Design a protein with these regions (language model features):
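Outer-membrane beta-barrel pore domains
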Residues: 50-52, 211-377
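Short hydrophobic/aromatic segments of transmembrane alpha-helices and their interfaces
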Residues: 6-8, 59, 135-136, 330-331, ...
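Bacterial Sec-dependent N-terminal signal peptides
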Residues: 1-28
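Glycan-binding loop/region signatures in secreted carbohydrate-active enzymes
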Residues: 35, 191-193, 200, 204-228
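Short, P/G- and charge-enriched loop/turn segments at secondary-structure junctions
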Residues: 26, 130-132, 230-236
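Ser/Thr- (and often Asn-) enriched beta-sheet segments in non-cytosolic proteins
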Residues: 24, 33-35, 70, 277, ...
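Outer membrane beta-barrel
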Residues: 27-164, 168-204, 282, 287-292, ...
Length: 380
């Protein structure tokens, strides 16, 4: 019954967007442009070395429908998504742009982490690295200002700790974000991107009976959500504030692609409790067996997919540690390889192999290495 209910909700939202678009199309003032957007990410996974009895299977990793509209200097985006048996509001924001500047307000990603802010279709692998999943945030409600030139990108914002699909009965915390990117080399098929981002955040002040008040949680499902267990998790209670810093490196050279990040989260805790630090990093590279070069999204300073039809070979190493200050969140290392075929700018087939090395205080499973093969098809 739950699945039927979710299906009916998503069908209603889909019909509402499509009906609205038809009505709007008949009454559009001159200069307004809009388009219906969609995304379909289907994944399947098989665990090859499987001492922990992980379940093989398939899933809709992401299913979306939405609309984009532009009018003069204004832009708007509204997108609904279905994943993990939940219907949720994804992006919901308006943007005003003037020359090289823009102001964005609504619900969207905070300006932190290359792998988090880029489109899921543009990811090299079926899933972001554990360091990114654990140490970054999803979309939040807020306002941000950005400025860009050929060689620089700057973004700063103010966000509440709230999203439209997970409203909290709480006095919401807030976050102040900043991101700076320098591109000493930026020309056709060649790019050097060096970035630095930081966030200062306060925890939610929830109701007195809520055990999770003043708590920051960091967690990761490992390398796949086919078996959706949380393998590494740290709940840092008695938190006063949090400071995150992230460094970025992105290099393009014709068929070659290199991307890496280091992320560190420091939690200042109340008197009598030891401060906590979590950290993680990843490094990935790609080579185009077919195709010529990679795209780059200058508006948000993040990597894109290969241009046109392409065949891509990828490799990635990820490390994450959530053990500190007596909190045993766990550690993980994993090595992944991928082969991606981009049929066109809308459709791609991705084959991934990941080898997971659990460290101390891993959750849910024994400290035994395992591997998984995933295949996914993306339609945007």
């Amino acid at each position: 019954m739950k699945i039927i209910g979710l299906y009916l909700k998503f069908s209603f939202l889909l019909s509402l967007i499509l009906t609205t678009s038809r009505i709007t199309a008949q009454n559009l003032p001159d200069g307004i442009q809009y388009k219906i957007t969609g995304r379909l990410l289907m994944d399947g996974g098989v665990y090859l070395k499987n001492p922990n009895n992980f379940g093989n299977g398939t899933e809709f990793n992401d299913l979306r429908i939405g609309v984009k509209a532009t009018y003069q200097n204004w832009g708007m985006k509204l997108e609904m998504g279905y994943a993990g048996n939940k219907v949720a509001i994804k992006d919901a924001f308006a943007t005003y742009s003037y020359k090289n500047s823009s102001i964005q307000i609504g619900q969207f990603y905070e300006p932190f982490s290359l792998d988090m802010i880029c489109s899921t279709f543009d990811l090299r692998f079926n899933q972001s690295p554990g360091a990114v999943l654990a140490l970054t945030n999803s979309r939040r409600m807020g306002v941000a200002y950005s400025y860009r030139t050929q060689y620089y990108y700057l973004c700063g914002g103010f966000f509440t700790d709230n999203d439209l699909s997970n409203l909290k009965n709480a006095s919401q915390g807030y976050a102040i974000d900043g991101r700076l990117v320098y591109r000493p080399l930026y020309e056709q098929a060649k790019l050097i991107h060096i970035g630095l981002a930081a966030i200062h955040r306060t925890p939610d002040g929830t109701l007195p009976e809520d055990e999770n008040r003043n708590t920051f949680t960091y967690k990761s499902p490992g390398v796949s959500t086919i078996d959706n267990r949380t393998l590494i998790q740290a709940d840092v209670d008695h938190a006063a504030s949090q400071f995150k810093i992230g460094t970025e490196l992105l290099i393009y050279y014709h068929k070659f692609f290199l991307q890496g990040e280091y992320i560190r989260a420091h939690v200042k805790r109340e008197k009598g409790f030891e401060n906590y630090t979590a950290q993680g990093a990843y490094l990935q590279c790609s080579w185009l067996l077919l195709g010529q070069n990679y795209l780059y999204d200058e508006e948000v300073a993040c990597p894109g997919r290969p241009e046109g039809k392409a065949l891509e070979l990828c490799a990635r190493f990820n490390y994450l540690s959530l053990n500190d200050a007596g909190i045993k969140g766990g550690t993980q290392k994993d090595l992944s390889f991928g082969l991606n075929y981009y049929i066109n700018k809308h459709i791609a087939v991705k084959l991934n192999y990941s080898y997971f090395i659990p460290g101390s205080h891993i959750k849910e499973i024994e400290s035994t290495n395992f591997s998984v093969v995933q295949i996914g098809r993306a339609h945007v």
